[in-house]
Amino acid sequence: MKNENNISLPQYVTLNIQTLNSSEDKTIRIKAKTLNFPLSSEDLRDISILEKKYDQEENCAGLAAPQIGISKCIIIFAVHEDAELKKWHPDLKDTMPKTIWINPSYKPIGIDKHEDYEGCFSVENATGPVARFKKIHYHAYDINGNQIQGIAEGFLARVIQHEIDHLNGKVFLDYVAPKKIMTKEEYLEMRKKAMEQENIKS
């Protein structure tokens, strides 16, 4: 696949849903490399590729470099105020414009968790409920090596935790009991029925 600048973009590294491993590329299941500053020209090229891959997607909360075969601690994500998104994720509170983080990490604030359904480009046509910390303190660097830190709550905290998991060789299905895994079609049907019930009650 090529973008408007004729730069070839890599395909996603996908996992076999039964084994949760990839026979083609181990990048998605190993700890990614921590980057040093100043970033090399190769690092900057990889960041550009990741951003272009992200920009071509619709309804994409975030991507991590290992998802496209780049074993480096780079993530890109965005969470905007959106009424439709809030229907699916009522805990949407904090927002953040499109952001690229290098070497990100987080620490939970408290022990409270919230369960919600997640999906991933690296696990095709599968979703399941994942309990994530409701509130976290994050730390990262921008591409110039400037420190970034702050507090995230709700859906934004979930997105950050999900993407950082990729840098540690984890995917969301690692936290989901096999019997709770469903296809996206099954999930959408479940949500449709739930919303219909809510409309009846109101």
From Swiss-Prot:
Binds 1 Fe(2+) ion. InterPro entries: Peptide_deformylase, Peptide_deformylase_sf. This is Peptide deformylase 2. It comes from Rickettsia conorii (strain ATCC VR-613 / Malish 7). The keyword Metal-binding applies. The active site is at E163. Its cofactor is Fe(2+). It catalyses: N-terminal N-formyl-L-methionyl-[peptide] + H2O = N-terminal L-methionyl-[peptide] + formate. GO terms for molecular function: metal ion binding; peptide deformylase activity. It comes from the Bacteria.
